[in-house]
Amino acid sequence: GCFGIHFRSRNFFMWTNKVISNRRAAKGIIFGDQGLFIKREVFYEAGMFPEIPIMEDYQFSLTLRDMGVATVMTENTLLVSDRRYRGSTIRKLMVMKHMANLRKRYRAGEDPVKLFEEYPDIR
């Protein structure tokens, strides 16, 4: 399972990001910033996180879904940093679009090493 997320920001686009992220998690696609929790046996049975530089949490969620593992999202939420989205509204939209594009390309089979080269690792 995972926790829902929220941002301290009152920006409409951050609220939208939260809604989309929580909706996706409710459908079984969980990202690392959502505080994934899982039984040890299931973690090992799923092959643990793949050794790839990006999308390892996404791939793990896809694997769990393919295995038929049901995921839940708690009513509790995690406060997630918005630092990768800081700046103007245009910047927020550009980052959101870029991240969605990286996921789409990953699903299409593009090499995660190549995708990682384009990842804005802002931490």
Predicted features by range, described:
Residues T89-E118:
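Catalytic core of nucleotide-sugar-dependent glycosyltransferases
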